[in-house]
Amino acid sequence: MDGYALFYLVGALRDGSVYRYSRNYYVIWYSSNKDYLERVIVSKLRILGFHNVRVYQYKRGAYRVRISSKQLFHILVNQFEHPLSTSSRKTPWPTPQRVKDGPLALQIEYVKGFVDAEGSVIKSSKGVQVDVSQQIMEPLKFLAQVLEKVGVKVTGIYLGSDGVWRLRIASLASLRRFAHYIGFRHPCKSKKLNELLGRPLPGPSKLKGIGGGAPQGVEPAA
């Protein structure tokens, strides 16, 4: 399987589920944005060889892509340690060891999927910020480590009054590096971030990173 597409889809499963029903092995990605699922999730699944894939509206304003694949199910459960979903509270999912052990380029694809699923762009009285939410802190600490490798400094990781952990990026320099190296493929989030940043993103030569330029082997977000 294509590693880039697979790692992205694993990250995007932060808003998804993996479960078995009778003899069927299901993997589902959710979003309130149909266009995102069609243009990004479906296209990456097709790269992995899943061609008979469609987006369904399962309730008002909510969409999903669901595939039945024993092979992908076992990859996600056995290699990426995804917990099996139940009807009860969602089980916390620490960062998979395979992701931790992977090369930086694949870790970045995982982060891209993660932020598309759980990231948000916020304009407040304090300025622009990107927040990434999660049930437990550990996955956000790993995200912070990867972001640091491309020169994105995280403002902090906070526990909200709602019991949800949030990673925050708030400095303009880090927001611009985030947009350049990670970014959003989710159309609404991408549009909002670029509009709030207010000017074209600089090229890699203008972004001081590891070694004074772009981190080795890391391409701009796509």
From Swiss-Prot:
Swiss-Prot/TrEMBL cofactor(s): Mg(2+); Mn(2+)
Cofactor binding annotation: 1-5 mM manganese gives higher cleavage activity than the same concentration of magnesium.
Variation of activity with pH: Optimum pH is 7.5.
Gene3D superfamilies to which the protein is assigned, alphabetical: Homing endonucleases
Annotated thermal dependence: Optimum temperature is 90 degrees Celsius. Active from 70 to 90 degrees Celsius.
Alphabetical keyword list: Endonuclease, Hydrolase, Intron homing, Nuclease
EC number(s) reported in the record: 3.1.-.-
GO biological process assignments: intron homing
Iron-sulfur recorded as keyword: no
Molecular function per GO: endonuclease activity
Pfam families attached to this UniProt entry: LAGLIDADG_3 (PF14528)
InterPro entries to which the protein is assigned, alphabetical: Homing_endonucl (IPR027434), LAGLIDADG_dom (IPR004860)
Enzyme class: hydrolase
Domain of life: Archaea
Record keyword Hydrolase present: yes
Quaternary assembly: Probably functions as a monomer.
Function: Endonuclease involved in 16S rRNA intron I-alpha homing. Recognizes the minimal target 5'-GCAAGGCTGAAACTTAAAGG-3'; generates 4 base 3' protruding ends 5'-AAAC-3' and 5'-GTTT-3'.
Protein name listed in UniProt: Homing endonuclease I-ApeI
Organism: Aeropyrum pernix (strain ATCC 700893 / DSM 11879 / JCM 9820 / NBRC 100138 / K1)
Lineage, uppermost ranks: Archaea, Thermoproteota, Thermoprotei, Desulfurococcales, Desulfurococcaceae
Annotated gene: apeI
